[in-house]
């Protein structure tokens, strides 16, 4: 089924945990196209596999910051990245009174005309003192124990009962941490459950780290790794602008049309994925097809021709089988080396088939369309 998820002051993953709990289902059965900001008032489509329509509505009226809207049966699940964009209503506060409406309007229109740096924001990194990319870095290195310890590490802003449970883990009392960790801390409880079940070895070291991570939803594990990719991307983009300026330069990447042979390969991959989607597992989890964006590095002749703008410049997320911009390759290596990651970033598999996958290069400069229109997702709230 597909339904509209409306939330505020709640992470997407936490909202889906609550939906699964009230529907008496598993979190792994729910999928979505992208995470939404915790601090925003957001609405997005979510799909759920073999979850009754009537069970989804049970969440309404139970949690003040979470509602679900109309639900209907669909043929395919949503997949991460399966969206063309987001629609925002943005509120700007504390604007100086001395600024005229004309000045404010011109500033807003400039966003649409000139664009803005396409940074990843807090929805990718989280809002706690232990960001998602810190866990992702450990996963990419295969440091399973480090990843578990990072997930369970104390953080600023924890409620007293959560802080107590985290401290018990640090003190080596896994059983006590499991006992005191509140039930709504699902990911921490899932990790602790496996760690306590598998116990310690003769040297007193916990042995279940890899299995504990495998107990987490696949989408959460990939989110951790995507967080690290995004962290590197943000730093590379900042370095690119600081050192090379606000105009295209030699070595920047731009998209080029695929050749006939490349287009045929893409069509064959899509057809193969469609054929594979006939199986029950494919219907449940979806089959992701990576359609390569063909790029090339700008030359001195390209710069002299002045045919490219900053909006044409693409910057790839780090991963395997990636074409990096020659003018920033050293910066990618430098940033990842700080975290103990070599340039062979995730050439192999991560825990439970988790890999840092190839991805579309992202525009360095993002554009904004200013056009008033009604919300694209209807929301109808019904309380039981």
Regions found by a protein language model. Name each.
Residues 1-384:
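Non-catalytic, substrate/partner-engaging modules appended to enzymatic cores
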């Amino acid at each position: 089924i597909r339904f509209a998820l409306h939330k505020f002051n709640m992470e997407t993953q936490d909202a889906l945990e609550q939906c699964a709990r009230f529907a008496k289902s598993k979190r792994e059965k729910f999928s979505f196209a992208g995470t939404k900001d915790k601090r925003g008032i957001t609405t997005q489509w979510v799909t759920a596999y073999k979850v009754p329509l009537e069970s989804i509505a049970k969440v309404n009226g139970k949690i003040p910051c979470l509602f679900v809207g109309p639900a209907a049966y669909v043929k395919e699940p949503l997949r991460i990245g399966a969206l063309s964009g987001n629609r925002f209503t943005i509120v700007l506060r504390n604007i100086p009174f001395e600024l005229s409406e004309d000045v404010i309007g011109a500033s807003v229109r400039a966003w649409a005309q000139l664009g803005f740096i396409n940074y990843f924001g807090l929805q990718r990194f989280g809002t706690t003192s232990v960001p998602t990319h810190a866990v992702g870095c450990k996963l990419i290195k295969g440091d399973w124990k480090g990843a578990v310890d990072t997930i369970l590490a104390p953080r600023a802003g924890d409620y007293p009962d959560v802080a107590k449970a985290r401290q018990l883990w640090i003190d080596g009392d896994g059983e006590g941490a499991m006992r005191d960790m509140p039930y709504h801390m699902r990911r921490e409880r899932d990790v602790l459950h496996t760690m306590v079940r598998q116990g310690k070895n003769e040297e007193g070291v916990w042995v279940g780290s890899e299995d504990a991570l495998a107990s987490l939803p696949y989408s959460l594990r990939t989110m951790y790794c995507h967080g690290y990719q995004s962290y590197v991307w943000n730093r590379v983009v900042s370095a690119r602008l600081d050192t090379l300026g606000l105009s295209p330069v030699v070595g920047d990447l731009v998209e080029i049309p695929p050749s006939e042979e490349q287009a045929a390969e893409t069509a064959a991959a899509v057809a193969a994925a469609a054929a594979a989607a006939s199986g029950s597992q494919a219907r449940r989890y979806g089959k992701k097809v990576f359609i390569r964006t063909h790029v090339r590095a700008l030359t001195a002749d390209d710069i002299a021709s002045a045919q490219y703008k900053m909006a044409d410049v693409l910057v790839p997320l780090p991963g395997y089988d990636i074409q990096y911009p020659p003018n920033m390759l050293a910066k990618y290596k430098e940033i990842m080396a700080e975290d103990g990651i070599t340039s062979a970033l995730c050439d192999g598999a991560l825990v439970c088939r988790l890999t840092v996958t190839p991805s579309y290069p992202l525009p360095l400069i993002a554009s904004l369309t200013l056009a008033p229109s009604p919300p694209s997702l209807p929301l109808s709230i019904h309380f039981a």
